[in-house]
């Protein structure tokens, strides 16, 4: 832990507080990120049958428990859940194929919109594009990991991961973040989009039409191309 580190805490609560998810506070001068889970959610991690159908939040709690240090555990509930979580396959904590498809589609969809706005002379559009690029780069970064079916563990962990495994992408991201010229920044942004989406088929062709498939399980590049061609035929009246 460094001087600027925060503290992540999992707090187990009774069902009365089941609507709690996260909180923030300060603990001895450090920022504290709080995650809340109910007793039943924690117990479900230890139940093999329930674990198979764990929802996204329970999977997040299980992932946290698998590598954390337990400070207080009345009744041994957390120890049992931790031991169970440590036996879960890595795939249980990884983004799903649906997550990967949604990330690929979103990066492509946003890029199409952003290209259109970049070509506008309207000052409102230009300012809107600047805003979109602010959060768009975050979407590209999180999408990079979702497309590769790697669990998102926060920005700091992402930077460390990229430094070790893909320093070229990290350098490109840093250049894009620092770039002040809008057109130069957009060129770097498109390069990031291409690199992030490469394992899923890359960027859409520079065409005006695309489609989003309902079932990610069938969302192969070929299926996406066929659906896009169908949508295009409707627009053209064929």
Where are these regions (language model features)?
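Short aromatic-enriched loop/helix-cap "lid" or pocket-rim segments at secondary-structure transitions
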Residues: 2-3, 46-48, 157-158
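Conserved nucleotidyltransferase catalytic core and NTase-mimicking acidic/glycine-rich helix/loop elements
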Residues: 89-238
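Short secondary-structure boundary segments
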Residues: 1-3, 9-13, 19, 77-95, ...
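Catalytic metal-binding acidic patch
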Residues: 1-39
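Short secondary-structure boundary micro-motifs
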Residues: 6-10, 19, 54, 128, ...
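Conserved NTP/Mg2+-binding pocket subregion across the NTase superfamily
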Residues: 23, 27-123
